[in-house]
Amino acid sequence: MKCENCTKTECSKKKKTEENGEILDAMALADGEEKSEFHQLAEAKIFLSDCLACGNCVTSEEGAKIFAQNQKELFKVLNRNKKCDSSLHKLVVASISPQSVPYFAVKFHLSVCEASKKLCGFLKSLGVHHVLDTTIAADFSILETQKDFIQRFRRQTQDEHAFPMFASACPGWVQYAERVLGDSVTPHICTAKSPQQIMGSLVKGYFASSKNVSPDKIFHLMVAPCYDRKLEALREDYYTELYNCRDVDCVLTSGEVMQIMEQQNISVKEVMEFPLENLFGETSCVFVRHEGTSSDGYLAHVFRHAAKELFDMDVQEITYKALKNKDFLEVSLEKDGETVLRFAAAYGFRNIQNMVLKLRKGKFHYHFVEVLACPGGCLNGKGQAQTMDGKVERALLHEMEEVYTRVPIQNPESNPHIQALYEDWLQGAESQKTKQTLHTKIVASAQSAARLDMKW
């Protein structure tokens, strides 16, 4: 089985090109590291991140930069802070993805809240100065996605690309759309940044200003469930030339952080507990999540908002209908006997392939689709819930889903700091600064144009 649009006789995950794979393998062996995202492809299986790691999409330069995002990069900064003159020190800030915390909860045999405190304590014991909750970044991403949907709905008669609208939070999906699917798909993707990159903007922008620190004097670490987040952090539009720094300097997966704990032979019981901070220096013992799926619930939030904003309907309960498989779900809204909204969630490469095929045939009649590269969503990220040969650790995934559902829900609109940041820092919810800070450009690459005529 091969990726759609792939012209190779053998997958580059098995037979790597000299330019990309062999160089990276040599680097890995020289450093005594595992090969991480460049592992062998599981037989008869294709994952979206495997496709993205093919030499046709990821250049050797990108591959080297992805590989360099490891614990050595973190410890290089931490050790420099201990040994060098204070003028060369960096403020080390770690942002924790909400989907990573359930992984540590299961591994530590603790509640999500307790696990977040242990994780915070461990990172601080290494020399990290601030460990931040990223809920506010997901709040902004959801709210901006809601706004984008309403605007598209109101201009749909003038814009042939208004619908379906695809969520943009998954970097694997966005990279695949830009580099392979091209401009037949990219105009349909929401321009709101992912929570990771909004957090990057907040840390290198608002947080840096509040601490009176230049953005290039902050080392921003992101702990995430997914290897594709490493590639996302390298996007050109997330780099600031003025300060010669990226919004997110290093991404470590949940599994990589756990490896650091194991290598240092640290017992969870020995780790002191510290609550996560927010951008304002406040701490809370309560860990919250968003309604809907474990991937921040874009479908649920956009659906409820659209029902109220467009049709003045309050949706009390959302009913998900599984179609061909459990990773393709449908939600619809009826008014006066007519279906006025049709939403879907499409997880995994196979469902993405089917979705795009129907879109090109004009048979994909949805208003909004929550698209994720990993089957089962972000909890099933390859950086925490999958083995190196691509097999899902189902028991672990099930436990993570169980603990995640016990976390209390908070709607983005309920976050008291959101409106303050819109008004005081972003100069208004509709300002140019808001668009520059919270949105990105989804652009088809030159490579994709050559592939549009290929058969599906």
Swiss-Prot record:
Origin species: Xenopus laevis
Keywords: Nucleus
InterPro entries, per the entry: Cytosolic_Fe-S_CAF, Fe_hydrogenase, Fe_hydrogenase_lsu_C, Fe_hydrogenase_ssu
GO cellular component terms attached to this protein's record: lamin filament
Matching Gene3D superfamilies: 3.40.50.1780, Fe-only Hydrogenase (Larger Subunit), Chain L, domain 3
Superkingdom: Eukaryota
Name of the protein: Nuclear prelamin A recognition factor
Name of encoding gene: narf
Keyword Nucleus: yes
Protease as UniProt keyword: no
PANTHER family named among the record's database cross-references: NITRATE, FORMATE, IRON DEHYDROGENASE
Protein's cellular compartments: Nucleus
